Amino acid sequence: PPAYTGKPTLYLSDQPPGSLAVPVGARVTLRLYGRVGALEITESYSDTQPDEPSPTRAFKIDGDGFIQIGADRWEIAATADMAPRIQPAGELTRTLDGEMRLPFAASDDYGVTAGSAEIVLNLPRVERRHGLVIDPEPREAIVVDLPMPYRGDRAEIEELLVENLAEHPWAELPVALTFTAIDAAGQQGQSAPVEITLPGRRFLHPLARAIIEQRRDILWSQDNAPRTARLLRAISNRPEGLFPGDGQYLALRAAISSLERSELGTVERDDVSKVLWDLAIEIEDGALAVALEELRRARERLAEAMRQGATPEELQQLMDEYREAMRNYM
């Protein structure tokens, strides 16, 4: 059989005469022992038959036909290699940090050898507002390899695509995802496009969320740089109490200055986007840490007051502080 089938060699002497299914592309080698010409060989695959009897003959199975050796005849049913099939096998799930999980199922008559997922921007579904009004810069499709079983039968597989594309410019935008499966013969099968919103990281702090939105706009198009600089400058106009640390305010002002340069290029724009991403992460995680510490302190104060026999009024005040800290943390 062809190598793509992964099947062992088949011996004709072990097969009873009659119908015989053989993969297209299989090579047949006949070797006869004894007196040459004692058994007549006829088959439908060679363009010409030998003029003289020969103890060997070789040919390729390219379709239905027959092989006859003496009185024994095999009717060959050539089985074509089918293209692999692949499709989603469940709903997309996501985590707060932007990790996406999408199950898929693939199958092939001789086994799936590889696969990929291609993600493209679904521009007609994008809500064209604010920085997304202008046309986006062209970007190549996202292509990620699919996980495959290390061992065992790959004729039927179910796996899970796990990927984190939270930093990609298309995060939180409509995209179309297409699965592709490949078999050993190089044939490909594709799923219908799956329309999803590409998961991004959830930013809960208002300042971090505003910075990420402006980062998205400059990655959508470099022409958004002047507008983004103006908005970031307005956001940071009164930094008192807005930034958890002075270093964050200075980092944002440096990013604004870079965006306002007339010679801003793609490399510089991408550098600024990295600064904005890191800044938003620092603000988000820092605010969470502060809220958690305030919640811990409020809980400890309440517990200590109960141990010391505080009055109902004092306990009520501390309970209100604890609830407020819990709301801030949540």
Q: Each predicted region: which residue ranges?
A:
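Extracytoplasmic/secretory ectodomains and luminal regions
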Residues: 1-330
